[in-house]
């Protein structure tokens, strides 16, 4: 018999597809489980990057941050793995918001063939990362409800 699920407070989340030249940003919520690409930040330095992020956080007021966790296809870390982890840790340290990590191995590859996505590829990748987060969140909640 399934246990009734407790009411869960909706989550507004902001996701990031981190890159050394550009950072894609998306926002969404756990009610619709959909993400919306916001922008791709091409900041010349980390101060400018975090200033842009601070403005987005003030506007959207998320209570959860999500960062793509890049790895090789076999799951092994590579040079961007440590950089993305550092970026996520900096987000947490600067803005005191929880950071969740989502496997982003194939997000850009899924979108690269779509001509409509090319102009804002990184923000659309962040959207896929965010939707994967909501999917995993759903799976975890359903597993707990069945226990």
Swiss-Prot record:
Enzyme Commission number: 3.1.-.-
Keywords (A to Z) from UniProt: Cytoplasm, Hydrolase, Nuclease, Ribosome biogenesis
GO MF terms held by the record: nuclease activity
GO cellular component terms given for this protein: cytosol
Role this protein plays: Could be a nuclease involved in processing of the 5'-end of pre-16S rRNA.
Name this polypeptide is given: Putative pre-16S rRNA nuclease
GO biological process: rRNA 5'-end processing
Subcellular localization(s) per the UniProt record: Cytoplasm
Classification via InterPro entries: RNaseH-like_sf, YqgF, YqgF/RNaseH-like_dom, YqgF/RNaseH-like_dom_sf
């Amino acid at each position: 018999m399934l246990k009734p699920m407790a009411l869960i407070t909706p989550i507004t989340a902001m996701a990031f597809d981190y890159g050394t030249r550009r950072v894609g940003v998306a926002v969404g919520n756990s009610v619709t489980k959909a993400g919306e690409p916001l922008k791709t930040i091409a900041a010349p330095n980390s101060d400018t990057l975090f200033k842009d992020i601070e403005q987005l956080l003030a506007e959207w007021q998320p209570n959860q941050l999500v960062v793509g966790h890049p790895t090789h296809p076999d799951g092994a870390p590579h040079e961007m793995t440590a950089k993305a982890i550092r970026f996520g840790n900096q987000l947490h340290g600067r803005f005191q918001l929880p950071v969740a990590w989502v496997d982003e191995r194939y997000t850009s590859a899924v979108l690269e063939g779509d001509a409509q996505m090319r102009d804002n590829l990184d923000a659309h990748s962040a959207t896929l990362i965010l939707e994967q987060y909501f999917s995993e969140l759903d799976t975890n909640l359903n597993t707990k409800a069945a226990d």
